[in-house]
Each structure stands twice: as structure tokens, then as C-alpha cells.
């Protein structure tokens, strides 16, 4: 039970670390500028979260299903080694060029942000920034596939989305005060990135040692 609670906490922190990544956190005010149109900021934020949840939970479901077919002790160890390499990349010891790229997806919005536009913005957020948060995301997906259950994989990614989405919810309710304070965090983003790298390495070690089985 303790191991499972530790796993859930680790995955939740991984989602939070994704929010604080140097490529996402600085542009949060832009997203809230769009979501605030029409005076339905809270509703639009939840629809935005629904959009990004659809992508990530679907990924978890798929990896959990594939894990049932492909995962063995050997593949688990290989996956753990790859996750550790991704963690080292996150620390900046060396760079993997593919993971430094982002696919910027432009979305045209009307004068007022509609429910559909907020949902689509969530989908494009997921697809556009996946390369940037790739090391963390890949680590969580590896953990999702380890149990060989599609529902387990989906639930792990749901926990990841909770970690990623919680700051969005807080910003939607307290955007004015939080956005002002958030500017001061920009100078610490490199430290958050290092923390994310350490978290990734820990997940890789846990995969190799199979501590969550």
C-alpha cells in the first residue's frame, strides 16, 4: 500500500514538474489570456483541462495495453535504463536534440473564447508541448505500462494530469494575484528542471528494481 501511495505521489509530482518546465511555465499568461475571453475563465479552464486529459489518458491506456503484451523483466529494465538516460538529459549533462523541439500549434480564436475553442486549445497544448515534456512524460508512460493493464495505465496518466492541471485550476480562480507572483518564479525554472531530472532518474531506478510490483 505504501509503495502504491509513493508511486501515485511521484506521478503527481511529475505532472507538477511538467507545468513548471522552462518551455511551458513562461507562456501560461498567454493561455490564460485566451481562456479569459468571454468572462467564462473557470469554465474554459476546465474544458481546456478536459482536452489535454483526453490526449494523455489515451496515451496511458494505450501504453498499459501494450505493456500487457510487451513488458517482461528484460523490457522493464531496458525501459528503466532509457528513463534514467532521459533524466540525465533533463539535468542538462547532455542533450537529446529531438526532445528540445516543440511543435507550436496556432489556434485562431474569436473575440470571445468559446467552449469548443477552450477544449481544442487543450488538445493542441497536449500535442504541441509533448516533445518538450517528453522526458517526464516518457517516464510516467513507462510506469503506466509496467503493470500490463490498460486501465492501470490510464489511471496513472490521470494522476499525471491532476498534477499538471492543479496549477491551471488555481490560476483560474486566483489568476490576478498568482500571475503577478508567478513572474518571480521564472528565474528559478532551471532549478525546477533539475528537480524534474532527479525525479525522472528516481522513476527509472524504481522501474529497474521493480519496487512498485
Swiss-Prot record:
Main location: membrane
Subcellular compartments: Cell membrane
One BP term from GO: cytochrome complex assembly
Any one cellular-component term (Gene Ontology): plasma membrane
Membrane topology type: Multi-pass membrane protein
One Pfam family it belongs to: DsbD_TM
Swiss-Prot/TrEMBL keywords: Cell membrane, Cytochrome c-type biogenesis, Membrane, Transmembrane, Transmembrane helix
InterPro entries listed in its UniProt record: Cyt_c_assmbl_TM_dom, Cytochrome_c-biogenesis_DsbD
Residue ranges of the TM segments: 15-35, 46-66, 77-97, 118-138, 154-174, 192-212
Similarity comment: Belongs to the DsbD family.
Function: Could be involved in cytochrome c synthesis.
Protein name (database record): Putative cytochrome c-type biogenesis protein HI_1454
Biological source species: Haemophilus influenzae (strain ATCC 51907 / DSM 11121 / KW20 / Rd)
Amino acid at each position: 500500500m505504501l509503495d502504491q501511495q509513493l508511486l501515485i505521489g511521484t506521478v503527481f509530482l511529475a505532472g507538477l514538474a511538467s507545468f513548471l518546465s522552462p518551455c511551458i511555465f513562461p507562456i501560461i499568461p498567454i493561455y490564460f489570456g485566451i481562456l479569459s475571453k468571454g468572462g467564462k475563465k473557470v469554465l474554459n479552464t476546465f474544458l481546456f483541462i478536459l482536452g489535454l486529459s483526453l490526449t494523455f489518458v489515451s496515451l496511458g491506456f494505450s501504453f498499459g495495453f501494450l505493456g500487457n503484451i510487451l513488458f517482461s523483466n528484460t523490457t522493464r529494465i531496458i525501459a528503466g535504463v532509457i528513463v534514467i538516460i532521459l533524466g540525465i538529459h533533463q539535468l542538462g549533462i547532455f542533450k537529446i536534440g529531438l526532445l528540445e523541439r516543440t511543435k507550436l500549434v496556432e489556434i485562431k480564436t474569436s473575440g470571445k473564447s468559446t467552449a469548443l475553442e477552450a477544449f481544442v486549445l487543450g488538445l493542441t497544448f497536449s500535442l504541441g508541448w509533448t516533445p518538450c515534456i517528453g522526458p517526464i512524460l516518457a517516464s510516467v508512460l513507462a510506469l503506466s505500462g509496467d503493470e500490463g493493464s490498460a486501465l492501470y495505465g490510464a489511471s496513472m496518466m490521470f494522476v499525471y494530469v491532476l498534477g499538471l492541471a492543479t496549477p491551471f485550476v488555481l490560476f483560474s480562480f486566483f489568476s490576478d494575484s498568482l500571475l503577478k507572483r508567478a513572474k518571480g518564479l521564472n528565474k528559478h525554472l532551471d532549478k525546477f528542471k533539475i528537480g524534474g531530472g532527479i525525479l525522472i532518474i528516481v522513476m527509472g531506478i524504481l522501474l529497474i528494481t521493480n519496487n512498485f510490483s
